[in-house]
Amino acid sequence: MWWGGFVLLLDAVKGLTPTFIAMKYASANLPETSQMHLPVAAGICAIIGHMYPVYLKLRGGKGVATALGVVVVLAPQAVGAAFVCFLLTVAATRMVALASMIAATVFGVTELWWLGADATKPQFLSLTAFAIGIPVLIIWRHRSNIARMLKGTEPAVTRSVAPSESDAVDDAESGSN
């Protein structure tokens, strides 16, 4: 199970790193009215590169963890709401794909709410487009999961618990080694 957490961390860092570097560069070298565009572009490139890697014949991941890394830099205020919705959805449905799509949507809605009237100002248009486009793209990448959910065949998350000593004794007594 810890491998999954490790991969999640690496994918998040894959999005966080270029976005963070672009944010630092932009804040030091670009006019305030265009500082957000470079980190948004870097984040989009990281997400698209994860979803459609050339070296894997354009067959990559769904982009959720990479988007998380990008969002931590671009819109940290929206991460909490998306994360809570992710956890609640997994707890209620045991479906990570559904939780990922809901969290992406909650991020977009939360970020647009946070931007408010500023969402249409030129310096925030790239962030507005990101808040709308990335959740749509993440949902698009989950098409096969959506089809399985509709058929009732989407796998649920299960807890893997190490067998207790009493389970081992029961197995030995029943002859199921």
Per-segment meaning from a language model:
Residues 1, 22-26, 63-93, 106-115:
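Interfacial segments of multi-pass membrane proteins
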Residues 1-16, 51-65, 91-102, 141-177:
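Interhelical loop and helix-boundary elements at the membrane-water interface
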Residues 4-5, 36-44, 68, 80-84, ...:
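Hydrophobic alpha-helical transmembrane segments
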Residues 7, 43-50, 86-90, 107, ...:
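Alpha-helical transmembrane segments of multi-pass membrane proteins
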Residues 17, 24, 39-59, 64-73, ...:
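Anionic-ligand binding patches
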Residues 20-41, 72-79, 113-129:
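Helix-coil boundary and interhelical linker segments in multi-pass alpha-helical membrane proteins
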Residues 59, 83-87, 118-127, 147-154:
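A cytosolic-side transmembrane-helix exit/cap motif
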